[in-house]
Curated annotation (Swiss-Prot):
The modification Phosphothreonine is found at T33. The active site is at Y176. CDD domains: RNRR2 (cd01049). This is Ribonucleoside-diphosphate reductase subunit M2. One of its GO terms (biological process) is deoxyribonucleotide biosynthetic process. The gene is RRM2. Its EC number is 1.17.4.1.
Amino acid sequence: MLSVRIPLAPITNPQQLQLSPLKGLSLVDKENTPPALSGARVLASKTARRIFQEPAEPKTKAAAPGVEDEPLLRENPRRFVIFPIEYHDIWQMYKKAEASFWTAEEVDLSKDIQHWESLKPEERYFISHVLAFFAASDGIVNENLVERFSQEVQITEARCFYGFQIAMENIHSEMYSLLIDTYIKDPKEREFLFNAIETMPCVEKKADWALRWIGDKEATYGERVVAFAAVEGIFFSGSFASIFWLKKRGLMPGLTFSNELISRDEGLHCDFACLMFKHLVHKPSEERVREIIINAVRVEQEFLTEALPVKLIGMNCTLMKQYIEFVADRLMLELGFSKVFRVENPFDFMENISLEGKTNFFEKRVGEYQRMGVMSSPTENSFTLDADF
């Protein structure tokens, strides 16, 4: 039976035109839109609103000096398609991140409660405050990735990595929030820890340091890459070491295992920042990089030796200061510059764990997790009948 097409009735009511889902739809400020086309942003967090003071009337800004000379930042009309791969080293970093995907549900916290209750009050105080810092800091890293880096960088391989990093930072933040939720039973104390950026001056100081870099309209991409390499490579290093110290004592297996997973991820994120820095044509001077790194070291040393001293869990504050300097030197080397502090690693238990640039977690496969087949070449998974036996 032939179908009969009924002609559309003419539109007599002008209001019917407003029913179209495309009416008034703007493609500005959507995913993969270059920053120059972005409209007014609705900022997700109070801290971001505090940093970003956008003008009431948007003004057309000229491209930042050097953007057209930077292959990473130059507008790329092929950014919507992944293949063919142009930056193979950046793509391999993305595949490493993809191979190491994990979720908070994989971490067993059942034994931690008994350990937590047996800890001294000062040890519980230290751990809870470190977790509060971690829970907030991953959100700040994501604020930077969403607001700045993902919009500025135009090469597809790096955008893939940043997208996956955002997902992993969300998992880290969920893991830390879950740890606080598991250990802290008092609702008021729990709320205090979840709002650490506003309730703890020591955490607020570190957060403000990072947030200032997100909101700095004058700083170059290269300077901000160094700053956030410092956030993930220096600001996290001392706290990671303090939790690994608990592992050395045989305490808190769930906390320490999640710390292994997260520190491995952050090591990779730090390595990626260094790789992006190496791809820049116009890099900040060594003097400027040293200034940023030294400033980050001072903030972290104050955090773990004065504001929240590691002596609360039995660690030596002087050695912790030295360890932070050691990590900073490794970061300077990975960025292609000379060491600043020239000190040895004072913590033997961190020898294979420190965020040293060339992450050795993939060789050691910490926690025995890596997605099967993700790092394999296509030919490795093919079936043949002519193999040698």
